[in-house]
Amino acid sequence: RKALGIAPDDFVFLFVGQHIWQKNVRFIIEALEKIKDTPFRMFFVGNGYAAEAMKELVAEKGLDKCVTFVGTLTEREAITQYYAAADLFLFPSLYDNAPLVVREAAALHTPAVMIEGATAASILTDNENGFLIPNDLDAFANRLRELIHDPERVHKVGIQASHSIVRSWEDVVGEVLERY
């Protein structure tokens, strides 16, 4: 955290992926606007066609001081620092079916927040190895605020995520061979 300029008591949200509207990144920004009276830091890692519009939206919502756009990171170690520094990994995409980024976050004890019913959310059990929230902006914002104030629970769920979501490549290859 120190290397990234993050104070020890800052609550940190993270998104890693393409900055495209299909990833539901607007939903993240709009939820953050609803909780901007609660201290947090948000890091968007990646790039994409919506990056500039996302930055404009963040400025428009008055979130410039707590939201940082990191850009594309090609060094695995640099990306790992952000995963390790984050308290929660925000992944409200309804578009993805098996995002590796959720497993990468879990490997570093960072639980994901996903939308109930999203295909990718099938790997999570709410409050056990991640957090599932209805596809409703107010519900999403309220849950984020609640989790900011309960870092012990977030940490506990992150530990469980690292045990239940992370899979070895041997397991993945075995499952693919079994299915196909």
What are these regions (language model features)?
Residues 11-34, 42, 49-55:
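A conserved mid-protein helix/loop that constitutes part of the nucleotide-sugar donor-binding site
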Residues 153-167:
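A short, well-ordered alpha-helix in the C-terminal region of glycosyltransferases
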Residues 55-73:
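Nucleotide-activated donor-binding/catalytic signature segment of Leloir-type glycosyltransferases, i.e.
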Residues 126-127, 131-137, 146-151:
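Conserved acidic donor-binding segment of nucleotide-sugar-dependent glycosyltransferases
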Residues 169-180:
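C-terminal alpha-helical cap of glycosyltransferases
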Residues 72, 80-86:
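Short alpha-helical donor nucleotide-sugar binding micro-motif in glycosyltransferases
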Residues 94:
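Aromatic "clamp/platform" in nucleotide-sugar-dependent glycosyltransferases that forms part
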Residues 111-115:
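Short hydrophobic beta-strand element within catalytic cores of glycosyltransferases
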